Structure formats: C-alpha cells, structure tokens
C-alpha cells in the first residue's frame, strides 16, 4: 500500500496532533493570563516577553515529543510574532530556512494572513503549500486564547514516514 492511498487518514492523524499541541499551548497561555502573569508588552515599539514562561513552554513542547518537526508561532493583537519555535528545515508559514529562524522581526505576508484568519474565524486548519516546487506541504492549525489576547499557529510537514507507519499499523494490525 502507498502512503498516498491513506493520505486522508494520515492527514487526520497529523491534524489531531497539531490540534492537541495548539490547544495545550493556548491552555498554558490562558492559565498564565488568569494567574496575572504578564506574557508580553510593547513599549515604544520594543517588545518585552516573559522569557521564564516561554522557555518553560518550549521545554514542555520538546519534552512531549509528539511532533519532531514543527513550528509554533505565537502572536499578540498587533499580529506580530512575540514568540516562535522553529524546528523544520523549511517553514512555509514564515518562509524561512531553519538557519534563518532567529529573525522574529520579519513581517511575512503568509504568517500575517494566517494570524488574521485565526482571529477572524476563532480557529482553523489549513494546508500550506510550498512556495517553490521542491518544498513539501505543511499542515497548519490555528487557535486563539479564550480572551483573544494571543493567537497560536502550529505547523508541521505532511511528509513524515514514521507517522505514516503508525497510521498503517492502526489500519493493518500485524501480529508478530
């Protein structure tokens, strides 16, 4: 059997993982906001973030290990990135290579459009096609915090051989 034959099931499997990731991030943001933590602030065009909170969040994401190649984009009401974790060789959302990922100041039309879409719809799932022929499609899940203070976008590649194997094993149980 080919992975292509199981593409809808495979995509649903990845979507479930991304949705869980996005919802757990928004839950952490909501909890911090409810506890009165200041997560980010703009002052005279300069961004300050709560590095303690976001470093802890990043550690939790890597420790969970549910996604091995992903991007997390957290933006505020200004539609600008306040925190980003880039862990893909190429990110269709930010249009960056992994080596370029430290630059949070870039305004990328794709990322801004997806943030706006999430704020407008309250949450969505979409496939991001690669900007060039040699790239791969990526699945994106967007969620907002309950009060609308932050938008969380999570993406991952749709080319995961290991994940395809897991899906195959659920469809075709093998007894060893």
Put a short name on every predicted segment:
Residues 25, 29, 72-74, 125-128, ...:
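Hydrophobic beta-strand residues in large extracellular and virion-surface proteins
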Residues 1-3, 171-176:
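Alpha-helical transmembrane segments of integral membrane proteins
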Residues 145-148, 153-173:
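Helix-start (N-cap) segments at beta->loop->alpha junctions
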Residues 1-81, 86-89:
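Juxtamembrane segments flanking the first transmembrane helix
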Residues 86-149:
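Membrane-proximal, non-catalytic sensory/regulatory domains of signal-transducing membrane proteins
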